Amino acid sequence: SGEGTIIINSGIAAGFPSPADDFKQNRISLDNELVKNKEATFFARVSGQSMIGAGLDDNDLLVIDRSIEPQNNKIAVCFIDGEFTVKRLLIKKGKLWLQPENSEFKAIEVTNENEFVIWGIVTNVIKKV
């Protein structure tokens, strides 16, 4: 399950302390660090460049929590007209907009004509470096 302790098995020094003692550490669980509600959390990969201004790059792994109440200015994964998208939720003058974080993309106004569901709120992003 990825939990436990890292043990460096270098024997017990009878003289000077082992240099490996400086590197002993507890193993962390990414589930414990990143997932607050296991039953409502899922992961998805970013595809595209529309959210680069928010630090979400192509192929990043998003941690998404469906139990968090959507709010103005939160980044959400939404299903609109048959497609998934990740955008910032903006409420302006009583209207809901899906705002990209890249000036090359236009905001999407959500209207009654759209098939629309907010799937969840992005809580974390996992990146490769």
Question: Could you tell me what each predicted segment is?
Answer:
Residues 1-52, 84, 91-95, 106, ...:
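Short, positionally conserved secondary-structure boundary motifs
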Residues 53-57:
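A short glycine-leucine-enriched loop at secondary-structure breakpoints
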Residues 59-60, 74:
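Structural motif
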Residues 63-64, 77:
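Hydrophobic beta-strand signal
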Residues 64-71:
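Short acidic low-complexity segments
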Residues 72-86, 90-96:
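Short, compositionally biased
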Residues 101-112:
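Low-complexity, intrinsically disordered Gly/Pro/Thr-rich segments
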